[in-house]
Amino acid sequence: MGKPWLRALQLLLLLGASWARAGAPRCTYTFVLPPQKFTGAVCWSGPASTRATPEAANASELAALRMRVGRHEELLRELQRLAAADGAVAGEVRALRKESRGLSARLGQLRAQLQHEAGPGAGPGADLGAEPAAALALLGERVLNASAEAQRAAARFHQLDVKFRELAQLVTQQSSLIARLERLCPGGAGGQQQVLPPPPLVPVVPVRLVGSTSDTSRMLDPAPEPQRDQTQRQQEPMASPMPAGHPAVPTKPVGPWQDCAEARQAGHEQSGVYELRVGRHVVSVWCEQQLEGGGWTVIQRRQDGSVNFFTTWQHYKAGFGRPDGEYWLGLEPVYQLTSRGDHELLVLLEDWGGRGARAHYDGFSLEPESDHYRLRLGQYHGDAGDSLSWHNDKPFSTVDRDRDSYSGNCALYQRGGWWYHACAHSNLNGVWHHGGHYRSRYQDGVYWAEFRGGAYSLRKAAMLIRPLKL
């Protein structure tokens, strides 16, 4: 039997090899053996990671080669930059040489011209004298200045060209954006365009041969006037029509008054411009003192198209126009007046044939601005037809304050502020079209549907209010 320690060594070597093959944790062992004399072969078994592999060597060499290639690429790029710079310098040198040759040729021409002016005997080598030499130097300086100015102009042209290209690109971008927005507006879900239905139109009402009363005729048109288109304007503001027997000159009796009815009770029986105290302000209004007992405050008048009623909320709130012509008293002043007590409303109408009509409401008031000056009306009486009760309890709407019941903007379609529903049976603040019947995409005239229909623009209209208790 052999030596026991030798067998133990062989067993340990076999166990180490099996553990390495089975993926056991790698360990190192140190064996101290007594000196022996071996006659056979000695074998070694250990983990494969202790021996160098060709793949590791190839990876390190590849990394080194990549580093060298990277350095060479950097050198090549640097050489390319230097070559480009040299090319630019060479181009500038060629341009300077060309410019120098041009200047030399120009100087030669100038010298020849000076020699020609000096006389026929002066040759190329002749002495031109001090004065021609000074002139030549001056011309040379002018040439240099002109060249410098040309270079500056070229630089400015280049800058302007760059700016023009930038602006052209910006315009192109904005045009494409506008086109895209036009395709999307008014946009709905999924970017699909929502097409709003056209505003409802009032059916054309047959002409009603309504006889104009004497009071209405005196109020709206005491004397014939020339018809004017809406594009024509008067040179002088037209005075409001006056009853017969009184000069049509605006007057300002002593005031201010609470309303026109108070001025009437104080003995002022002439119609004209009066000053009323409305809240903390004093406003000028037209008081009609001879129509149905007087005391009427004119809050709206249309007669010649001299005032544009297609305006904003603030203008309708404060008022605009002149009280002795076309004007709108203002939503806030009317609210202040009607908040003092019960009022009645009288609407006077006249067509282009001189026929007049009236609509009377035994109750009229406006709510405050917090409720958008909502309209409150009483019972209707008259011969014009009731085209305003449909607007009862409706807020006032303008092009910039859309309060109507329509999905679109009635004030935009009908070109004026009004107590719109969806949209209107009347609108006395529309466009003053000349001649009655008019052509327009929408019903945007001065109309009262029950009197001449929605496609007929009236010649004159007025709205007057008065306290019920005089």
From Swiss-Prot:
Its main location: secreted. Disulfide bonds join 260-287, 410-423. The keyword Coiled coil applies. The gene is ANGPTL6. This is Angiopoietin-related protein 6. It comes from Homo sapiens. It is found in: Secreted. It comes from the Eukaryota. InterPro entries: FIB_ANG-like, Fibrinogen-like_C, Fibrinogen_a/b/g_C_1, Fibrinogen_a/b/g_C_dom, Fibrinogen_CS. Glycans are attached at residues 58, 145. The keyword Disulfide bond applies. GO terms for molecular function: signaling receptor binding. The lineage of its organism: Eukaryota, Metazoa, Chordata, Craniata, Vertebrata. Residues 59-116 form a coiled coil. Pfam families: Fibrinogen_C. Keywords: Angiogenesis, Coiled coil, Developmental protein, Differentiation, Disulfide bond, Glycoprotein, Secreted, Signal.
